[in-house]
């Protein structure tokens, strides 16, 4: 074997080794409008994290223990979910596998959306909508009570670049990324996509109950 061939084999071997040893990709999530996050979640609550600890949560297919972080919480209000208050929230132990870090001590309030696990428990990931309560707009806070639920039959389509279009009347085009280069823009903060009497969907501004007929954008 010539020197060039040996060099090539060595380079390929090093490349393969680097690939095998490369850390897992970080958690990746598609942006969603707050209304979508509300509609997709089993549970949506306002809460504080009181304490946290690492707990075992069964075993993987190889018999290795699965670790999760358990947050004991104080629920302030439930906007969507079971009749029983949520007492514990579970998440993965690292952000690389979509684990969520909450401030503990009971001082910081959060809006937390996630999946129900039953018996006063829920599970959250970085792909769920979890934000400090005081960062929400007044419209967002009010929409949690009724407005977002009214739009769960509508579809919000994110526009990543111009041109973009809706493909059916029950869609609303989410333009924040194009207009503001920010997914937490004006439509996310102040608008909800609501079904109209003719079955189509349109953006509605504000949190007061809409008229039976309303335009695509209506001031409160």
Curated annotation (Swiss-Prot):
Q: Which segments carry the region annotation Involved in metalloproteinase-binding?
A: 27-30, 95-96
**GO biological process assignments:** negative regulation of membrane protein ectodomain proteolysis; negative regulation of metallopeptidase activity; response to cytokine; response to hormone
Summarize the PTM comment: The activity of TIMP2 is dependent on the presence of disulfide bonds.
- Reading the lineage from the top rank, the first entry is Eukaryota
- According to the record, what induces this protein's expression? Down-regulated by TGFB1.
Disulfide links within the chain: 27-98, 29-127, 39-152, 154-201, 159-164, 172-193
Keywords from the UniProt entry = Disulfide bond, Metal-binding, Metalloenzyme inhibitor, Metalloprotease inhibitor, Protease inhibitor, Secreted, Signal, Zinc
NTR domain location, by residue?
27-152
Q: Which GO terms describe its molecular function?
A: metalloendopeptidase inhibitor activity; molecular function inhibitor activity; peptidase inhibitor activity; protease binding; zinc ion binding
Please give the Gene3D superfamilies that the UniProt record associates with this protein.
2.40.50.120, Tissue inhibitor of metalloproteinase-1. Chain B, domain 1
Major localization listed first in the record, in broad terms:
secreted
- Where does the UniProt annotation locate this protein? Secreted
Q: Where is this site: Involved in metalloproteinase-binding?
A: 40, 61, 67
One family name in Pfam for this protein: TIMP
Keyword Zinc applies: yes
Annotated residues for binding of Zn(2+): 27
Q: What does this protein do?
A: Complexes with metalloproteinases (such as collagenases) and irreversibly inactivates them by binding to their catalytic zinc cofactor. Known to act on MMP-1, MMP-2, MMP-3, MMP-7, MMP-8, MMP-9, MMP-10, MMP-13, MMP-14, MMP-15, MMP-16 and MMP-19.
Record note on quaternary structure: Interacts (via the C-terminal) with MMP2 (via the C-terminal PEX domain); the interaction inhibits the MMP2 activity.
Q: Which family does it belong to?
A: Belongs to the protease inhibitor I35 (TIMP) family.
The protein's name is Metalloproteinase inhibitor 2
């Amino acid at each position: 074997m010539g020197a060039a061939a040996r060099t090539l084999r060595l380079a390929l071997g090093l490349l393969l080794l680097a690939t095998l040893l490369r850390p897992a990709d970080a958690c990746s999530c598609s942006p969603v409008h707050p209304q979508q996050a509300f509609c997709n979640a089993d549970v949506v609550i306002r809460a504080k994290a009181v304490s946290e600890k690492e707990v075992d949560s069964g075993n993987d297919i190889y018999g290795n223990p699965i670790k999760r972080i358990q947050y004991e919480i104080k629920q302030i209000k439930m906007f969507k979910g079971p009749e029983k208050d949520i007492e514990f929230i579970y998440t993965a132990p690292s952000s690389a596998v979509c684990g969520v870090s909450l401030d503990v001590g009971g001082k910081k309030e959060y809006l937390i959306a996630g999946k129900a696990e039953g018996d006063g428990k829920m599970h959250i990931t970085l792909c769920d909508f979890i934000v400090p309560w005081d960062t929400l707009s007044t419209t967002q806070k009010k929409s949690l009570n009724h407005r977002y639920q009214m739009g769960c039959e509508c579809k919000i389509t994110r526009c990543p670049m111009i041109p973009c279009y809706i493909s059916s009347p029950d869609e609303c085009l989410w333009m924040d990324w194009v207009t503001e280069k920010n997914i937490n823009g004006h439509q996310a903060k102040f608008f909800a996509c609501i079904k109209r009497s003719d079955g189509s969907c349109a953006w509605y501004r504000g949190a007061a109950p809409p008229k039976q007929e309303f335009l695509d954008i209506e001031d409160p």
